[in-house]
């Protein structure tokens, strides 16, 4: 039985400016998450720790963070740590990956395919790493093929599986599922896409490759539990994968309807009903929407203060007042003319995108009108 821990897309020292004064605290969270992963590597006595890229930012990465990684990897020796650099941490001459000395149990993959043999485990690990931030060709096009005489074959890669779940990341190092099948390895440890996803071998009907997702949420799009993958590969080639939660905090993104709210207290009571089960240590992003009483305009500072118990609480107000727009447009007033103009723009829109922009503009106009009413 062969076992491994697979992670990717840690993004240490990433420039997450939206965190403002919480930035260094979140960087500490990411380091503690890596320590949690290290503890799993040791406690589960795995054979390998596989890291599929975007570990430490090339731009903005700090030497102190690189030293932290060096010490962390040394603490799991002699367990091999196999790293395939990604587009955010390419294998460049001036990167910490090359300018620092690393423990002997750290195995780097470069833009030239690497092949590391572990005869005592009857295993070969193949890998390829970015040499620059932008790669538009499939690295598998130059894969040299498997070595004979070994029972287990693993691969570590950072890139995009074409036709995978849509993601906002650039399709760097694009690969097809068929290329992975043709490589004929037992498992491909992938990185680049921050949303967890597994790919099943079309013939063998077992996991062939996977993205574990980022182990600590980086933006408000990376919500919920964040995990690493624990893999076990038996002598017959049967692979099982287990997702293990490791994040220090969770990110929550909610849309809360303020329908009918006439006071701050009514709105807060409705919000508490939805936010009450979220841990104080977590990050919460709320969008308020829906029609509210025209005489009530939510105060963002008040709401931020009321929910300051959360590690981070950010709120956006997209509500609109319960104003009779048709009645206003019939009046000869500035407000009525404004709404009539927006209604005309919406009616003449040439695409759904233009119509949506007009609708949002109308909501903004109604919000401003409501704010002036008594």
Where are these regions (language model features)?
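N-terminal active-site segment of His-dependent metallophosphoesterases
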Residues: 1-68, 356, 360-374
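Conserved residues at the C-terminal ends of beta-strands
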Residues: 52, 191, 289
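Accessory, non-catalytic peripheral segments of nucleic-acid enzymes
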Residues: 238-374
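Glycine-rich, Lys/Arg-enriched anion-binding loops that position phosphate/diphosphate groups
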Residues: 200, 208, 212-215, 219-223, ...
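His/Asp/Glu-rich metal-coordinating catalytic cores
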Residues: 23, 48, 57-227, 232
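Glycine-rich phosphate-binding loop signature in dinucleotide/nucleotide-binding domains
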Residues: 43-45, 147-149, 277-279
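Amphipathic, non-transmembrane alpha-helical secondary structure
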Residues: 31-42, 67-70, 140-144, 265-272
């Amino acid at each position: 039985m062969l076992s491994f821990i697979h992670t990717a897309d840690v993004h240490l020292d990433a420039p997450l400016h939206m965190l403002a004064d919480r930035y260094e605290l979140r960087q500490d969270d990411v380091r503690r998450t890596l320590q949690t992963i290290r503890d799993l590597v040791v406690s589960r006595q795995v054979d390998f720790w596989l890291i599929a890229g975007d570990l430490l930012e090339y731009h903005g990465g700090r030497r102190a963070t690189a030293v932290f990684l060096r010490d962390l990897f040394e603490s799991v020796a002699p367990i091999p740590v196999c790293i395939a650099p990604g587009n955010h941490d390419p294998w460049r001459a001036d990167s910490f990956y090359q300018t620092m000395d690393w423990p002997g149990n750290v195995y780097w993959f470069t833009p030239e395919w690497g092949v590391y043999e572990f005869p005592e485990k009857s295993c070969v690990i193949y890998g390829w790493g970015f040499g620059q931030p932008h790669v538009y060709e499939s690295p598998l096009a130059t894969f040299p093929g498997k070595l004979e005489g070994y029972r287990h074959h693993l691969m570590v890669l950072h890139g995009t599986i074409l036709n995978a779940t849509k993601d906002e990341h650039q399709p760097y190092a694009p690969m097809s599922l068929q290329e992975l099948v043709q490589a004929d390895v037992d498992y491909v440890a992938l990185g680049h896409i921050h949303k967890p996803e597994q790919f099943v071998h079309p013939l063998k009907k077992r996991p062939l490759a996977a993205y574990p997702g980022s182990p600590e949420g980086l933006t408000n799009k990376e919500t919920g539990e964040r995990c690493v993958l624990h893999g076990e590969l038996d002598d017959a080639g049967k692979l099982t994968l287990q997702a293990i939660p490791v994040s220090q905090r969770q990110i929550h993104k909610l849309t809360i309807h303020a329908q009918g709210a006439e006071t701050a207290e009514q709105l807060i009571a409705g919000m508490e009903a939805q936010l009450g089960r979220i841990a104080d240590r977590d990050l919460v992003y709320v969008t308020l929407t829906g029609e509210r009483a025209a005489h009530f305009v939510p105060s963002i500072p008040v709401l931020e203060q009321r929910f300051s118990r959360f590690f981070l609480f950010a709120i956006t107000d997209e509500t609109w007042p319960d104003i009779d727009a048709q009645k206003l447009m019939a009046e000869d007033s500035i407000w009525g003319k404004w709404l009539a103009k927006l209604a005309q723009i919406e009616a003449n829109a040439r695409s759904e995108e233009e119509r949506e922009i007009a609708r949002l503009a109308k909501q903004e106009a109604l919000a401003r009108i409501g704010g002036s009413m008594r």
